Amino acid sequence: GAVRAGALTLLAAMVPFLMASEGWDDHSRARRRTGVDMAKNYLNSLAPNAVLFTNGDNDTFPLWYAQEVEGIRTDVRVCNLSLLNTDWYIDQMRRRAYESAPLPILMDEEKYRQGTRDVVLIDRNSDPMDLLTAMNFTLDDDNLQQFPGQKGYFHLPGNTFTVPVDSASVVASGLVSAKEAKLLKDQIQWTLTNGNGNTQSYVTKNHYAALNMIANNQWERPIYFAVTTGPESYLGLQDHFRLEGLAYRLVPFKSPKNDNPNILGAIGTEIMYENVMDKWVWGNMDDVEHGIYMDENNRRMVTNVRLQMANLSEALLKERDPERAMEVLDELMRAMPKENVPYSRVMMPVA
C-alpha cells in the first residue's frame, strides 16, 4: 500500500511539470510584443487628434494599454462602438482624456440616458437631408412618435444624408491631397445601410451617437474606422473611406470605384506607404533566429496585416510604381516570415 501510494504521489507531482513543459510556449510572454506593437501600428498610422472607432475586445484593449501604460498617442480617442450603446460611455467620450479633446457628441445628457433614444426609427424617405438638420429633428422632444399600446419612438426623417464640404478648408488641412481635390463637391451624400448593404429601418444608440459626432465634426477632426470593425459599423459610408494603414479614414469625397474586393473606398498610397515602411513595428515576429510562438489570435491578426500590405502593393502597381510595390512585399515577407507565421490563403495574391 505504501509503495502504491508513493507511486501515485510521484505521478501526481509530475502533472504540473508536464503541463508547464507542454504549455509553456502558449503562456510565456517572453519576447512576445505583437499585441502592443500592433496597437502602436494602429495608433501611429492615424493623423493627429484622430477619433478611431473600434468594436471588439481585441481591437480595443491593446490600444488602451498602449495609451494608458506606455503613453502612446494619447491625442487619439479610441471610441468603442459596442460601449457607445451606454450612456455612461457617451459621458466619457464627451469629456477630455489626456491630450484628446472631448468628442463632438452635441446633445444633453437627458437626450441619451438609458431608455431614451436606445433605438431611433428611420422613415422610408430617400430625399437627401442635411445630417445635422436630421440630428436636430430627432433631438426635438416634440417629434416623439407615439404608437398604440407602445412607448413612443424618436425617428430620423429619412435614410439619405448629406454633410457639407468646404473644399478650400479640407485641402488646406491636408485631409485631401492635390490629386484628390478634383473629386471634391460641395457635399457628400450617402444612404444609411446595414452590414448586408440593405437600407436600415432603425439605428441603435451607438450608431446614432456616431452620426451625431459626424454631423457636428464638419471635417475638423480626423475620423477613422478600424478595418476590423466590420460593415455593420460603417453606417453605409464605405464609398467615402480611404485606407491609410489598419484603419479607414472618412474623407469628403466619393472614392473612385475599386475592383479589389478586399478594399472599401480608396487607398491613400502615400500615407500608407510611409506608415508601413517607416512607422510599423513587428513585435519580434521578424526574429527567425530565435523564433516566436504565435497563438491563434496573433495569427488572425497577422492575416489582416498581410492582407492590407498586399492591398497597398497592388494599389502602388496600379499607380505604375513597381519599385515601391516590391518594397512593400519585401517588407511583408521579412517582417512576418513563414518560420514564425505560417502562410495562409491570404498570401495567394502575393505569390
Task: Give the label of every model feature segment.
Residues 1-51, 61-349:
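ER/secretory pathway lumenal C-terminal domains and tails of membrane proteins involved
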